[in-house]
């Protein structure tokens, strides 16, 4: 006979999807190597503090809200990447901007502060905003 295994693992909440997939593959491989009678393993990866809340806006809706919120703030027009983390019934927002946007650490701090304040006032479900300045352009 064949043995099917269904495993749920909890991972640190801020890891990337690709890292979660890598962890799942390592678990799957480890189980099938250690127990040859296992024919298939399904690994479910969940954030340790992952709680589904249907009142939270989805990505499309949230990005539209942020676009409205930041439309009058020129630095926001340079956002390279936006990552969302749905955790504990709220949203943690991660925004990446080009390093060249700020001419000094003080200016970078001011840009970050204004983006955070506007986002958290406009979208009450946002609990945290992290603004990153990067030299990457992709």
What residue spans do the PLM features occupy?
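Peripheral (non-transmembrane) domains and long loops of multi-pass membrane proteins
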Residues: 1-138
């Amino acid at each position: 006979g064949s043995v099917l295994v269904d495993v749920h693992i909890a991972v640190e909440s801020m890891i990337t999807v690709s890292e979660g997939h890598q962890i799942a593959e390592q678990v799957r491989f480890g189980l099938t190597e250690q127990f040859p009678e296992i024919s298939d393993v399904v690994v479910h990866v969940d954030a340790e503090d992952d709680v589904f809340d249907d009142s939270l806006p989805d990505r499309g809706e949230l990005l539209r809200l942020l676009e409205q919120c930041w439309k009058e703030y020129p630095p926001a027009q340079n956002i390279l990447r936006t990552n969302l983390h749905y955790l504990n019934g709220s949203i943690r927002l991660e925004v990446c901007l080009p390093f060249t946007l700020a001419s000094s650490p003080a200016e970078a701090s001011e840009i970050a502060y204004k983006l955070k304040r506007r986002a958290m006032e406009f979208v009450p479900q946002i609990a945290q905003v992290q603004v990153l300045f990067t030299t990457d352009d992709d």
